[in-house]
Regions:
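A structural motif corresponding to the C-terminal end of an alpha-helix
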Residues: 10-12, 40, 75-83, 111, ...
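Conserved strand-turn element in the central/C-terminal portion of the radical SAM core barrel
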Residues: 24, 48, 52-56, 75-100, ...
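Catalytic cores of alpha/beta
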Residues: 29-34, 92-110, 150
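Short, well-ordered secondary-structure micro-motifs
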Residues: 29-30, 58, 95-96, 128-130, ...
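Auxiliary Fe-S-binding modules of radical SAM enzymes
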Residues: 109, 115, 123-257
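Alpha-helix N-cap and loop-to-helix initiation/capping positions
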Residues: 2, 60-68, 96-103, 137-145, ...
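Conserved, mostly hydrophobic/aromatic
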Residues: 19, 47, 85, 108, ...
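Conserved SAM/AdoMet-binding glycine-rich loop
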Residues: 1-78
Length: 257
């Protein structure tokens, strides 16, 4: 409260004050304390729930369970705060992909945050998950498999007044964004457009996105960009015909976070 008072005194025209907040930090407050923070000007919380799966939360050593995620989100909303929940696609690997989609959607359907901010996972080699990748207990998903996970996740989200957004460069389909109540089907249609591409075009778009040649699916229709992406793909294949594109794309994603 002292920090908020100082902000208000020095910036009297401030309209939004935002803070990052762990789920277990929120639940350590009681409802009256959260409302006092809101009345003092803290009106937007960014919370990195990552997933609604207890199994995955334990795997990544997050430090709290799915019940804490749900309780914290509901507490923030009850305090009349704007709530952004950050989730990670691919954080369970191939083994827990469906679990991640289903349980994360289940939690968010209860919370009904104002924003659902979607990030594709980039696993750093020195991390614990990187160790799991090396020992074979965690299997990296291809970009297409992460998109399929996103489709499963989006399908299971209710049509609520939450804004769904792929806003970070690590995401493959940046145009998948919109209000879940009014634009959910449009977002699913964009995902289906990608999944319906011929195999070679899906790979080309994936490589082009990771090299920042393409940004939107429609960029595939631009001859100069298509040619540039094709040239780069052939260079990759000429140097390593057996390249593991799941590992290569993960390497690029983890370098961007």
């Amino acid at each position: 409260l002292r920090i908020l008072d100082a902000i208000n005194q020095n910036f009297p025209d401030m309209q939004y004050i935002t803070s990052y907040a762990r789920a277990d930090s929120i639940t350590r407050k009681n409802p009256a304390e959260l409302k006092a923070l809101r009345q003092a000007g803290l009106n937007h919380l960014y919370s990195g729930m990552e997933t609604g799966s207890d199994q995955i939360l334990k795997l990544i050593n997050k430090g709290f369970d799915a019940d804490t995620v749900v309780r914290s989100g509901c507490m923030a909303k009850d305090a009349d705060m704007i709530l952004s929940e950050f989730i990670l696609l691919g954080i369970g690997g191939k083994e827990l992909s469906e679990e991640n989609a289903a349980q994360t959607a289940k939690a968010l359907n209860i919370i009904q945050p104002d924003f659902i901010r979607v990030h594709a996972t980039g696993i750093k080699p020195e991390s614990k998950l990187g160790e799991f990748v090396r020992d074979g207990s965690f299997t990296l998903q291809s970009e297409e498999e992460i998109v399929i996970e996103q489709k499963l996740f989006l399908q299971q989200l209710h049509e609520m007044d939450s804004y769904y957004v792929n806003e970070h460069i690590v995401n493959l389909l940046l145009e998948v964004r919109g209000n879940l109540r009014t634009e959910k089907q449009e977002m699913l249609s964009t995902i289906d457009r990608f999944l319906a591409l011929p195999t070679n075009e899906k790979l080309l778009f994936t490589v082009g996105r990771r090299l920042n040649i393409f940004f939107l699916l429609d960029d595939l229709k631009k001859p100069e960009l298509h040619q540039e992406a094709e040239k780069n793909l052939q260079q990759i294949l000429s140097k390593n015909p057996d390249v593991d594109f799941a590992a290569l794309c993960n390497y690029v994603r983890q370098s961007q976070i």
